[in-house]
Amino acid sequence: DLMLFEQRRGQANVTSLVERVSRFTVILKNPNKRTKPVMGKILKAIKDLPHIARRSITFDRGSEFVSWPQFQAKIGTQTWFCDPSSPWQKGTVENTNRRARRWLPRKRDIRQLTDHDIKEISDRLNNTPRKCLGWKTPAEVFRENMLAEMGRSPYPQK
């Protein structure tokens, strides 16, 4: 999903990617809404993840996602689209965006933020325990799921 900021602060925006099961979040800073840079950053962020972490991606109907066929062909991930004006169809990402707005309010000039600053915000989101995860953090659940998929226990053997 794309998070926009005040127009007078330029075209810079952020894309939020949220893994549905663990709520693990990646936030990416974009210079504008053009599809090539936005989709390029998403591809770079997820291409090395195990397939379980990118089985499908749900986009909204924004123009920044029009190059989805090339994206899907490059990583072999099923893509879905929400119905127009239906944010409840991607409630997890909308909730995550609301959480991220604590650090990224609409009035913030994100052009001043570095990629490191953006990563710190993702880290805060990923290291905050969530009731829906049994008070585990998204990072813990994501790690457990990835290790389980690879056939390893997330906990050291005694």
Pin down the residues of each PLM region.
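Mobile genetic element proteins and their domesticated derivatives, centered on retroelements
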Residues: 1, 17, 23, 42, ...
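Anionic group-transfer/hydrolysis microenvironments
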Residues: 3, 21, 31, 62, ...
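Active-site beta-loop-alpha junctions of metal-dependent nucleic acid enzymes
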Residues: 6-10, 15, 27-51
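Short, surface-exposed connector motifs at secondary-structure boundaries
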Residues: 22-24, 49-54, 103-104
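Short small-residue beta-strand/loop micro-motif enriched in glycine and branched aliphatics
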Residues: 23-28, 81, 106
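Short, surface-exposed basic-aromatic patches at helix termini and helix-loop junctions that form
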Residues: 47, 70-77
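RNase H-like two-metal-ion nuclease catalytic core shared by retroviral integrases
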Residues: 59-72, 81-104, 111-123
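C-terminal domain-tail junction helix/linker
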Residues: 106-158
